[in-house]
Amino acid sequence: MISRRLTALGLASLGFPRFAGANETMPVPGKRAWAEQVPVIRMGLLGGENDADRLARVDGYKKLMEATFQVPVKLLVAADYAGVIQAFAAKQLETAYMSPAAYASAWMESGGDVVPLAVTQEQDGSTSYVSVLYTRADSGITSLEGMKGRSLAWADPNSASGYLIPRSEFREMGIDPEPNKYFSRTGFAGGHEQTVVAVMNKQYDGGMTWTSGLGDPATGYSRGVLRMMVDKKMLDMKDLRIIWKSRPVLNGPLTVRKGTPAAFQADLLAFHLALPIAHPDIYRSFDMGSGKGWVPVKHEDFRPFIDMLQQEAAQRRRR
């Protein structure tokens, strides 16, 4: 069982709040006054999955939002996390569903012009996930110690689970995550899904990704990249072995640009809080698995990720 200590990143102040969507109803369909300022809802999709699958996964969600608010929804399909971060900084997006580290980066890059609205609540009532290091089941590597002298693939430099969290925790353990130190080599595979594929194709010995850590391991757990790939029949969990798990990490937030109208932000939050009950299939597809719903959050909950980014920048300056 995965430990869920309150010292986990971002969870100390948040705790385990109640399920916020149980008594929520979907906003009544109709055009809003805020549509004069937001005539198109521009939404960013983080990288890490191929474009066709990303668009198919959110198609029902996009159509429902358009029908509810009666304005077009334009999707920005970014090649990587940085694409969405930079689009927020350039005021080219209204909203995106982000990782916690990507939110922190967007907040820093935009001068504080983003606000977190809500995070996923898992089936056990928690609001966290774990970063995991995995290898091929036939690799003979069964522990983090077995990765010494082996190659490791990171997912994305702006990913919490795929880069920042493991690097931080490895340093705490006395493991230098830089290339040619503990690991023989490291590199970026181009996203979470691409990292799994690279490991399965023996381009790297191990890789990093995220999972809820809950539910049946054979199905890729209840939520996360592994679950998504199992559902798409891209992965059989019998071919993969998880050899290390991080401390629990606060789930990434649904994010909105701070400069948008308050009524728009309130409608967007209400839409998402009601989504799991009103449209469970659309919710599961959008949220990459079977979470329980959404819980409101505030910027202070993500302060640890801003601190981590600043520490990572300091490490780069010392190289």
Role assignments for model-derived ranges:
Residues 1-14:
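N-terminal secretory signal peptides and thylakoid transit peptides that target proteins
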Residues 25-45, 49-60, 225, 256-319:
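An extracytoplasmic/periplasmic, membrane-proximal ligand-sensing/linker region
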Residues 28-104:
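Extracytoplasmic small-molecule ligand-binding "clamshell" domains
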Residues 46-47, 130-141, 245-263:
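A bilobed periplasmic-binding-protein/Venus flytrap-type ligand-binding module shared by bacterial periplasmic
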Residues 77-81, 92-110, 119-120, 192, ...:
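Beta->alpha turn/N-cap motifs
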Residues 88-89, 147, 199-200:
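Hydrophobic residues within well-ordered alpha-helices
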Residues 119-163, 167-179:
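A conserved helix-loop-strand patch within extracytoplasmic ligand-binding domains
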Residues 153, 157-261:
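Pocket-lining segment of extracytoplasmic ligand-binding domains
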